[in-house]
Amino acid sequence: MEGNQAGSSLDSLIASFNKRIGELQELVIARNMYPASTIPDLSAIDTALSSMELQVQSIKDRLREETEAIPKAKKLIEASLKQQGKLQKMSIYAPSHFPDKATMLNSDLNRCLLQENAKQYEQHSTLSSLKFDEEAAVLPKEKKGRGSPPLWYITVEELNSLSSYMRGRLTLEKVNAAINDMASYAEANAHLIAASKQKLAENLWEKALKLRDIVTEQAVKGKHFFLETDMKGPSLKLDNTGKAILTVLRHLGRISETRIGQNRVIILMKPH
């Protein structure tokens, strides 16, 4: 389309030049009646015509360059569209929300760690020794050897394989963001299990003891887990949406559930 416009402009310019040349020819005929006085005028006309010819040639060269550049521009546009398509496909499998696990850990835990570290230096050495003996008797051996919780995200194919009734209004981004939350809950519990009593406040120590009782059960040994009461967001909460997400993840083999005492325990599972 740009080539057509340039060609149309060139035709208009040539027509204008032809009209001007015709007028100049008429002037030449009129001035031939006085040859001696028209020589300077003819020289000026020749110079003007030469300048016009150069301008026309310059326009033609520019038009040719633009025409030759069109195929290259088309190839570049096609390559850009292909790359855009690849990036869009990749973005489908990536969750839109990647929360920092460190910020997801219980804020009370972090605050109490700092407070209790300061108090350690004020405690009597004999009392510290007794507390370490008490801790050694309480801590289970299972607290060692755990790595970071796994992040087994679901794919769009897995989500589409679910019935519309089970899937509801859930999206790939919501479910994978919930998987991030579950890993954060499990990591926070692992910190509580591994922390010493001196670094925990009384309320957190009670939860740590409860988790250490749970971790000795055969169903959760060596696995990452969290409690139903840990579900406090930002993406996975104990509401209807959260329960629907758990149902989907349980169906897709990402979690299993068990009840230990009065606690409903959700265990992170590797998909088959």
Swiss-Prot record:
One matching Pfam family: SKA1
Gene3D superfamilies: Ska1 microtubule binding domain-like
GO biological process: attachment of mitotic spindle microtubules to kinetochore; cell division
Keyword RNA-binding set for record: no
Coiled-coil intervals: 48-75
Keywords: Coiled coil
MF annotations from Gene Ontology: microtubule binding
Domain of life: Eukaryota
Family named by the database record: Belongs to the SKA1 family.
Protein name: SKA complex subunit 1 homolog
